[in-house]
């Protein structure tokens, strides 16, 4: 706390009077009563965790924060993120360790995009400080000088299984926060006046985020339960709860309420609906360009169309080509460094309340580390767009650690998530534009090697609509691919046609939702024969998605070609053949299917 602002005297005009302090204390007591009653009625919940933070909540919501109670989605309202295992508005966090990253995204948006006065408060448990994602967020907030962000550590000593590593050694938490570059205050979390003071002082600090390390006690105000182990996530027995509620009620001295301060209304108006590219794709059939590069170009083009498009990257921007966007719009590019978990949570925060159209990009393989954050974003139905490059064995020389072979399966499990797998540059640009306007999470899967443009600039694309690239009345088998395997399917079709064997070739474009109508009609036109081919593991991939889509039709047979085993390093075309997804293997599969 070397900064003068951090040591600022608490001015008389900002101090709550004795009556206000009593009201804040009484409100904390009422919050305890509400938590006891709510958890008893459902036989589930965390009354002891609620009790430890009641004074913090009372001071924040009824003295410090500025918001309109009648308009909780107001863009000028202060934001509150509850990272403890409790429900809250704006963005769900669920498992611990995600809330601070979301708060960072909100604070970054407020400071750099909205340039508004609203502040962001994040309440965390001491237990979740064992999560690495917390410290990814701490580093991010410090690096970007998020002085509109306050993180409150509710240090109540106890976790689910007993005492936490640091217990009540408050100085350990203080030193850790200060080491990460945060302005840090230590406070008695039961003292409403002290809480009012440190939150006011935090509002005076510039160029640094503030951490408030509050010493609290789990189950505060409940005799024989306060600071006792084995009460985590346990509602109180009803007969005991009634006595405790009466005890707490006896300590309440006033029925007065406090109204929150109104927000400062200085957020800009934002329109992120019906975002359109300003011109068609500028590619010609036969051009060669990697879809990862086409994606970077499309992001820059979208950024020109709407100034609320923002791009985040995890220190891979020269490989994902998000650097193209960064060069054009550096003020709307967020470098998150090698912290994929935090990158996803920051994107969730940026997109909250409809303030931005957020795209987060990195290697698709690296997104597996962030899956828990992705999953919670899906549960919240957040409108974020995630781009995963370097997919499948077609990555080539970089080897197995860089090859995403699980990503489709991962994103298929996310409710209402749209999965784009564009084949060429034209379809990639359309995928980016469609994702910007889609509801819910979107995942765009891009490829490392250059591929040929096969669609004209005038081609139209829609979510859930596949493209039939080859078809005739003599087709015997439907071959379904996406991305890199579409080219293998087309090559197989050319070779087979020389032998008077004709196959129908489908480019899925979106893996979720599938174009079931086109798949089924094509299968029926080819005597019920389908072959899927994908640069992905068989589990959870395109083959399984297609099988599920046609499972009720006993006359349709599906044969899947997919990568099996741990891949090696090599040339892209060598690996496609080695792992059974090249044109040669498609030809063999077609002939075997016809023999059967």
Curated annotation (Swiss-Prot):
Record: residues binding thiamine diphosphate: 49, 94-96, 127, 156, 218, 232, 340, 366, 402
GO biological process: glucose catabolic process; thiamine metabolic process
Taxonomy, superkingdom: Eukaryota
Keywords: Calcium, Cytoplasm, Developmental protein, Magnesium, Metal-binding, Thiamine pyrophosphate, Transferase
Needed cofactors: Mg(2+); Ca(2+); Mn(2+); Co(2+)
Catalytic activity reported: D-sedoheptulose 7-phosphate + D-glyceraldehyde 3-phosphate = aldehydo-D-ribose 5-phosphate + D-xylulose 5-phosphate
Keyword flag Calcium: yes
Protein name: Transketolase-like protein 1
Organism per entry: Homo sapiens (Human)
Gene giving rise to this polypeptide: TKTL1
């Amino acid at each position: 706390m070397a900064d003068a602002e951090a040591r600022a005297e608490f001015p008389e005009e900002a101090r709550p009077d004795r009556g206000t302090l009593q009201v804040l204390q009484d409100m904390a007591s009422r919050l305890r009563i509400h938590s006891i009653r709510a958890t008893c009625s459902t036989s589930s919940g965390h009354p002891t965790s609620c009790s430890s933070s009641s004074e913090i909540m009372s001071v924040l919501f009824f003295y410090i924060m500025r918001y309109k109670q009648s308009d909780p989605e107001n863009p000028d309202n202060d934001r509150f993120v509850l990272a403890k295992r409790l429900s809250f508005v704006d963005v769900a966090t669920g498992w611990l360790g995600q809330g601070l990253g979301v708060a960072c995204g909100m604070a970054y948006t407020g400071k750099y995009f909205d340039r508004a006065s609203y502040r962001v408060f994040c309440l965390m448990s001491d237990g979740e400080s064992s999560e690495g994602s917390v410290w990814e967020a701490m580093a991010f907030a410090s690096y970007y000088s998020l002085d509109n962000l306050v993180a409150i550590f509710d240090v109540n000593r106890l976790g689910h299984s007993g005492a936490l590593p640091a217990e009540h050694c408050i100085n350990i938490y203080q030193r850790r926060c200060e080491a990460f570059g945060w302005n840090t205050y230590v406070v008695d979390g039961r003292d409403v006046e002290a809480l009012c003071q440190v939150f006011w002082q935090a509002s005076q600090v510039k160029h640094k985020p503030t951490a408030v390390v509050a010493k609290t006690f789990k189950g505060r105000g409940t005799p024989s339960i306060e600071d006792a182990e084995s009460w985590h996530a346990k509602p109180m027995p009803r007969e005991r709860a009634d006595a405790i509620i009466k005890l707490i009620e006896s300590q309440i001295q006033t029925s007065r309420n406090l109204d929150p301060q109104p927000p400062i209304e200085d957020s800009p108006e934002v329109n992120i609906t019906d975002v359109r590219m300003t011109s068609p794709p500028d590619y010609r059939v036969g051009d060669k360009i990697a879809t990862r590069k086409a994606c970077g170009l499309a992001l820059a083009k979208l950024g020109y169309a709407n100034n609320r498009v923002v791009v985040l990257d995890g220190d891979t921007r020269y490989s994902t080509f998000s650097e193209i966007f960064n060069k054009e719009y550096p003020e709307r590019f967020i470098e998150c460094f090698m912290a994929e978990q935090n990158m996803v949570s920051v994107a969730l925060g940026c997109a909250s309340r409809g303030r931005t159209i957020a795209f987060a990009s990195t290697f698709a393989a690296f997104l597996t580390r962030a899956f828990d954050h992705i999953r919670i974003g899906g549960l919240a139905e957040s409108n974020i767009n995630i781009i995963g490059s370097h997919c499948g064995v077609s990555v080539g020389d970089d080897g197995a650690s860089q090859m995403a072979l699980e990503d489709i399966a991962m994103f298929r499990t996310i409710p209402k998530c749209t999965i784009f797998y564009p084949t060429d540059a034209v379809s990639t640009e359309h995928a980016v534009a469609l994702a910007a306007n889609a509801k819910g999470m979107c995942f765009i899967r891009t490829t490392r090697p250059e591929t040929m443009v096969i669609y004209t600039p005038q081609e139209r694309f829609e979510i859930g609509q596949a493209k039939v690239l080859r078809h005739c009345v003599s087709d015997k088998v439907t071959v379904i691919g996406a991305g890199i395997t579409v080219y293998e399917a087309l090559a197989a079709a050319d070779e087979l046609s020389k032998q008077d064997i004709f196959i129908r070739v489908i480019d899925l474009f979106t893996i979720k939702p599938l174009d079931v109508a086109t798949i089924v009609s094509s299968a029926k036109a080819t005597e019920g024969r389908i072959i899927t081919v994908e640069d992905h593991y068989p589990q959870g991939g395109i083959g399984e998605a297609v099988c599920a889509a046609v499972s009720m039709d006993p006359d349709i047979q599906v044969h899947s070609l997919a990568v099996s085993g741990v891949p090696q390093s090599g040339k892209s075309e060598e690996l496609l053949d080695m792992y059974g997804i090249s044109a040669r293997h498609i030809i063999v599969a077609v002939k075997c299917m016809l023999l059967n």
